[in-house]
C-alpha cells in the first residue's frame, strides 16, 4: 500500500519505505522508517517519491511544528546518507552485512554483544533487501546463508536474527 502524497504521518506501528526511481525504472530506496518516526514526501525535490508500507501500519496524520520539521529533515538526511554510504560499498558481501547492521542499529535491540532484529517483522524479504542495497535476490540469499555458516549472522528465534559484535568487527 502507498500513503497519500503531501501529508506528514507519525508511525505508531509498522514500517515504511520511501522510494523513487531512476531513468531506467530501477527503485531507489531513500529511507526506511518505523515506530515513532515522521514520514512524508512533501519536502522532497525528487519526483516521484512514494511512501510505501512495508508492513501493516498504524499512522496518524500529523501537523509538525517547525522544530519537528527540522528534526525530521535532519533524520531524513541522515537516513539517506547512511543508505547511500552502504550502497557505495563495492563488495556485495560487505554491503549486505552493513545494511543488516544498519537495520539492527536503527530498528533492533542493540547490546554490547551485538544487534538483534527481525527482517520478518519488517517484511524485508530477500527481494526487498536486494532492492535497498542494489543487489540481486539470489546474491542476498547466498550471502545470508554464507553469513549464517560463518557465524556472522545467527538465527536466535523463528523470526529474530542476531549479528554478533565480534563477528562484525572481523568482517569490517
Task: Give the label of every model feature segment.
Residues 11, 22, 148:
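Short, acidic, Ser/Thr-enriched surface-loop or helix-capping motifs
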Residues 21-23, 44, 62-64, 158, ...:
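Surface loops and adjacent helix of pleckstrin homology
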Residues 29-83:
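Cyclic-nucleotide recognition modules
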Residues 108-172:
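Phosphate-/nucleic-acid-contacting segments
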Amino acid at each position: 500500500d502507498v500513503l497519500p502524497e503531501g501529508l506528514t504521518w507519525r508511525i505508531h506501528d509498522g514500517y515504511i519505505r520511501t522510494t523513487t526511481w531512476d531513468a531506467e525504472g530501477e527503485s531507489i530506496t531513500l529511507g526506511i522508517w518505523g515506530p515513532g518516526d515522521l514520514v512524508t514526501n512533501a519536502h522532497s525535490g525528487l519526483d516521484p517519491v512514494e511512501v510505501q508500507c512495508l508492513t501493516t501500519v498504524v499512522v496518524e496524520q500529523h501537523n509538525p511544528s517547525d522544530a519537528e520539521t527540522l528534526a525530521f529533515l535532519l533524520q531524513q538526511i541522515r537516513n539517506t546518507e547512511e543508505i547511500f554510504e552502504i550502497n557505495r560499498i563495492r563488495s556485495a558481501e560487505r554491503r549486505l552485512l552493513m545494511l543488516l547492521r544498519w537495520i539492527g542499529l536503527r530498528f533492533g535491540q542493540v547490546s554490547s554483544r551485538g544487534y538483534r532484529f527481525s527482517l520478518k517483522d519488517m517484511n524485508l524479504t530477500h527481494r526487498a533487501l536486494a532492492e535497498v542495497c542494489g543487489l540481486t535476490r539470489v546474491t542476498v540469499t547466498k550471502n545470508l546463508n554464507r553469513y549464517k555458516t560463518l557465524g556472522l549472522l545467527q538465527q536466535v528465534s523463528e523470526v529474530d536474527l542476531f549479528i554478533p559484535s565480534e563477528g562484525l568487527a572481523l568482517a569490517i
